[in-house]
Curated annotation (Swiss-Prot):
The keyword Repeat does not apply. The keyword ATP-binding applies. This is GMP synthase [glutamine-hydrolyzing]. Disulfide bonds: none annotated. Catalyzes the synthesis of GMP from XMP. Keywords: ATP-binding, Glutamine amidotransferase, GMP biosynthesis, Ligase, Nucleotide-binding, Purine biosynthesis. Residues 8-198 form the Glutamine amidotransferase type-1 domain. Residues 199-388 form the GMPS ATP-PPase domain. ATP binds at S226, G227, G228, V229, D230, S231, S232. GO terms for molecular function: ATP binding; GMP synthase activity. GO terms for cellular component: cytosol. NCBIfam families: guaA_Cterm (TIGR00884), guaA_Nterm (TIGR00888), PRK00074.1 (NF000848). The active site is at C85, H172, E174.
């Protein structure tokens, strides 16, 4: 932890689907928080000097062979500890209590009753609704602990050893279904851990600028600038830190949205006075993608070719030591960690060659998407960039399903431009987290101008979300959808049908490929 962060809450990851929510909630309070593997040693944690430690939930039983554990010496560090669900069970197991399989598993909402006035429940109602998700439970709390809350199926729903600042809850306060979950976490963060809540994006900028300067020194940094939110924020942040030591390369791979290439050069080269080199690599990418229809293969080809183009261009430059990337927290999570399966290979995470000549700088890799937008606003980046639609590294290459052609790319490009224009016309940009068009590899029969047609179908995908980890399909008004559909079939050649995707994530991902 950098010395510019004077307080931090450390969350140890035991594999719960809600882990990232804990970190997010705490940051929303104005307190810096990081999620780290459960394998951190007590000595490593001591060096990080957190104000508090949270043991997350997880799918294991403390008695399972190979179940996730932590260094039990963390209970000797004189640092407040909060165990959530599996974290409470692990605390109980280490400190001499007893955990058993529940006779009745408990998933969903439950009513709990608070005993006395424990610190975690200060100023909260005696009876409240919480979210349970457990198969084991604490049947005997460790010596010296008090039982702070009970429920019908979980007699020890919360426990504490106040003199040591050890707390455990069997439910999930980080989930919004827990009625006073945020208040409970605030009581731990501010009441127990004595944090002051002064962390902000302004602090983050100062912290990251110091880290960038300390890391880079007087050396040169190269940044792949796409014009998307992530790479734009990275470029402006690093430029603010080291000025002309940053060179940006903008690769136009022919897979961009309408008007994007021109917009990138105008905004960053002219508006921010940054050194931006534009590379026209359209033919190179499309030739590599000929005959390829598998989505993972397309992602890998685009990712690898991007690096090869980048290498070719960087070879023309002298003295470049660092490569900056806009990798986010969600990229790392979805690309697979010790406790998470790989969902997709991310362009920023999975496509780097082993012999890459640069060292990486990833200043956004602890931030979620909404935090990156807040950071961009704090840096003075225009709203049309900060609130630009999330755009994958492979670009329109994964919004054309199956094999890519220039004709198909133009269909997606034009239909997407219409969608974005109408969403803006109706003032819905801030209400919908992401929206785009996709071209499935199918044709259908239609009738246009009294003639039979056999043309492409365009799919519209629009979702609401906070960070992209989960999402719901956006309830766009029917009249807006009708206007979009009418314009697409009339203005985009070779399209005779428009459909709307009403699938949430999960089970679907946001992108179709």
């Amino acid at each position: 932890m950098t010395n510019l962060v004077n307080e931090m809450i450390l969350v140890l990851d035991f594999g719960s689907q809600y882990n990232q929510l804990i970190t997010r909630r705490i940051r929303e309070f104005g307190v810096y928080s990081e999620l780290h593997p459960h394998t951190l040693t007590a000595e490593e944690i001591k060096e990080m000097a957190p104000k508090g430690i949270i043991l997350s939930g997880g799918p294991n039983s403390v008695y399972d062979e190979g179940s996730f554990r932590c260094d039990e010496k963390i209970f000797d560090l004189d640092i407040p500890v909060l165990g959530i669900c599996y974290g409470m069970q692990l605390m109980t197991h280490y400190l001499g209590g007893k955990v058993e399989a529940a006779s009745q598993r408990e998933y969903g909402k439950a009513d709990i009753h608070i005993n006395g006035t424990p610190a975690l429940f200060k100023d909260l109602p005696t009876d409240q609704v919480v979210w349970m998700s457990h198969g084991d439970l604490v049947v005997e709390v460790p010596e010296g602990f008090t039982v702070d809350a009970t429920s019908a199926h979980c007699p020890n729903s919360a426990m504490s050893l106040a003199e040591k600042n050890f707390y455990g809850v069997q439910f999930h306060p980080e989930v919004r279904h827990s009625e006073y979950g945020n208040d409970l976490l605030k009581n731990f963060v501010f009441g127990v851990c004595d944090c002051d809540g002064k962390w902000s994006m302004e602090n983050f900028i100062e912290i990251e600028m110091q880290k960038i300067r300390e890391t880079v020194g007087d050396k040169q940094v190269l940044c792949a600038l796409s014009g998307g939110v992530d790479s734009s924020v990275v470029a402006v942040l690093i430029h603010k830190a080291i000025g002309d030591q940053l060179t940006c390369i903008f690769v136009d791979h022919g897979l961009l949205r309408k008007g994007e290439a021109e917009g990138v050069m105008k905004t960053f080269s002219e508006g921010f006075n940054m050194n931006v080199i534009k590379v026209d690599a359209k033919d190179r990418f499309l030739n590599k993608l000929k005959g390829v229809s598998d989505p993972e293969q397309k992602r890998k080809i685009i990712g690898n070719e991007f690096i090869y183009v980048f290498d070719d261009e960087s070879d023309k430059l002298k003295g470049i030591d660092y490569l900056a990337q806009g990798t986010l927290y969600t990229d790392i999570i979805e690309s697979g960690t010790a406790t998470a399966q790989t969902i997709k290979s991310h362009h920023n995470v999975g496509g780097l060659p082993e012999d890459m000549q640069f060292e990486l700088i990833e200043p956004l890799n602890t931030l979620f998407k909404d935090e990156v937008r807040a950071l961009g606003s704090e840096l003075g980046i225009p709203d049309d960039i900060v609130w630009r639609q999330p755009f994958p590294g492979p670009g329109l290459g994964i919004r054309v399903l199956g094999e890519i052609s220039e004709e198909k790319l133009e269909i997606v490009r034009e239909s997407d431009a219409i969608l974005r224009e109408e969403i803006a016309n109706f003032g819905l940009e801030r209400d919908i987290w992401q929206y785009f068009t996709v071209l499935p590899d199918i044709r259908s029969v239609g009738v246009m101008g009294d003639a039979r047609t056999y043309d492409y179908t365009i799919g519209i995908r629009a979702v609401t979300s906070i960070d992209g980890m989960t999402s719901d399909w956006a309830r766009i008004p029917w009249d807006v959808l009708e206007k979009i559909s009418t314009r697409i079939v009339n203005e985009v050649k070779h399209v005779n049908r428009v459909v709307y995707d009403i699938t949430s994530k999960p089970p679907a991902t946001i992108e179709w490929e």
